[in-house]
Amino acid sequence: MDENRKKALAAALTQIEKQFGKGSVMRMGDVGAVRNIEAISTGSLGLDLALGIGGVPKGRVIEIYGPESSGKTTLTLHIIAESQKLGGTAAFVDAEHALDPVYAEKLGVNMTDLLVSQPDTGEQALEITDMLVRSGAVDVVVVDSVAALTPKAEIEGEMGDSHVGLQARLMSQALRKLTGNIKRSNCCVIFINQIRMKIGVMFGSPETTTGGNALKFYASVRLDIRRTGAIKKGDEVIGNETKVKVVKNKVAPPFRQAEFDILYGQGISREGEIIDLGVAEGFIDKSGAWYSYDGNRIGQGKDNVRNFLCENPGIAQAIEARIRDKLLPKGGVEAPAEADVPEPSED
């Protein structure tokens, strides 16, 4: 760059900083420009690896959607528990009024420190979310769910009244306000969403999410979570087989998948994932029904090995650390070009 252009740029930067404050524009090579993306573990080793950075990114909007009883709230409660383990503060905006504190505690959530709000209207829920984010003291905010964010006009109106596009407009306006604050405060905001069917769709998927299109654009990560089968012990069903697809990812390559078990009353079976990934990556040897680690037999059959790892958390952590070290990128994560799956809105 020639001297005149350098002087012109320096003058422009000085003027911008004078008018809008120091740090309003900076070079990415400067010390103040943060390039590494911090992540919070999801509680699932396979999903952490599928997300490419070891969890959900901080300072971003996340959307988790899926059918009923697929594990959406369970997954967010695990994220809250992992954040609290690192000394973080978490908030749960319970628009559905369906949070089970006993179940949350079983998943490792510290209910004493968890901030819970049960708002009356969608506007109130999103205003509370914005204020928590702007405080800069909250690490994770979960909104459960977008479908339950009822606009004030709808609550005050009659049951049969038509309110076309009200929720979509509410979400669009809220996300415009929220996004900048979320980035500045480095808070992770997770929206849980439900699925609806579009009528008259001949080709492609008839499924869509509620609340319009805005969330699809503003979300850095979108996770599609599905129940794929039942886990049985004899005739008794003790859990769900779950599959999560990373539909959109702005911080790592998208379209990866993770499969894990959700056990009733326990949540995500981390030990089950460690066994599967340990065998796949060669850290655990499987010979017939026997499993071995570092030359020592640790059990016959997956259930026995799972129990062994539950009783010996040190070994489980050592195997997990080796898997993460091998499969997760070292150093800073640079975001690739966005890849999105366009879906028309119901609104």
From Swiss-Prot:
The membrane spanning regions, by residue number, are none
Which InterPro entries would you find in this protein's record? Answer: AAA+_ATPase, DNA_recomb/repair_RecA, DNA_recomb/repair_RecA_CS, P-loop_NTPase, RecA-like_C, RecA-like_N, RecA_ATP-bd, RecA_C_sf
Q: Which GO terms describe its cellular component?
A: cytosol
Q: Name one GO molecular function term.
A: ATP hydrolysis activity
The subcellular localization recorded is: Cytoplasm
Q: What does this protein do?
A: Can catalyze the hydrolysis of ATP in the presence of single-stranded DNA, the ATP-dependent uptake of single-stranded DNA by duplex DNA, and the ATP-dependent hybridization of homologous single-stranded DNAs. It interacts with LexA causing its activation and leading to its autocatalytic cleavage.
Main location class: cytoplasm
Q: Which gene encodes it?
A: recA
Alphabetic keyword roster: ATP-binding, Cytoplasm, DNA damage, DNA recombination, DNA repair, DNA-binding, Nucleotide-binding, SOS response
The UniProt similarity line reads: Belongs to the RecA family.
Source organism of this protein record: Allochromatium vinosum
From what superkingdom does this record's organism come?
A: Bacteria
UniProt-annotated binding residues for ATP: 66-73
Annotated GO biological processes are: DNA recombination; DNA repair; SOS response
The UniProt entry, under PROSITE patterns, shows: RECA_1, RECA_2, RECA_3
Per the UniProt entry, the disulfide pairs are none
Q: Which named protein is this?
A: Protein RecA
